[in-house]
Amino acid sequence: IVIPRTMEDLDLQKVAGTWHSMAMAASDISLLDSETAPLRVYIQELRPTPQDNLEIVLRKWEDNRCVEKKVFAEKTELAAXFSINYVEENQIFLLDTDYDNYLFFCMENANAPQQSLMCQCLARTLEVNNEVIGKFNRALKTLPVHMQLLNPTQVEEQCLV
């Protein structure tokens, strides 16, 4: 899957801090369609390291409870792309952010034959911003695969530790 690169001038330190998963989309909806689906994760915090890597704190349902996990994303030659080892996903990239309100990112499994893509719209607050969700939907349309949208915006659906 060839992804348009939009964040070449990313300031990684500015994405640090608390985020909330507001919308999710995937090329294969089975990756998201149940609370225990493999990529149904709720981002809590992004922590850039001094080496420009990224520690991602997320929550996910496992064994009928919400657990916190950390995913280490290693920098690549592209400012907004990172290598990860999470489930079968092997790359994460930031599609767009204004640093203060929203951040769109995607996780990709580039290995054939199970190529897949999952993207999320993150927000700094739990307040739903329809303008940002609209922008996320437009960003999804630029991707080379059809994405199916899931809106986990009801707070009770969120996985809280």
UniProtKB/Swiss-Prot annotation:
The keyword Disulfide bond applies. SUPFAM superfamilies: Lipocalins (SSF50814). Keywords: Disulfide bond, Milk protein, Retinol-binding, Secreted, Transport. It is found in: Secreted. Synthesized in mammary gland and secreted in milk. Primary component of whey, it binds retinol and is probably involved in the transport of that molecule. Belongs to the calycin superfamily. Lipocalin family. This is Beta-lactoglobulin-2. It comes from Canis lupus familiaris (Dog).
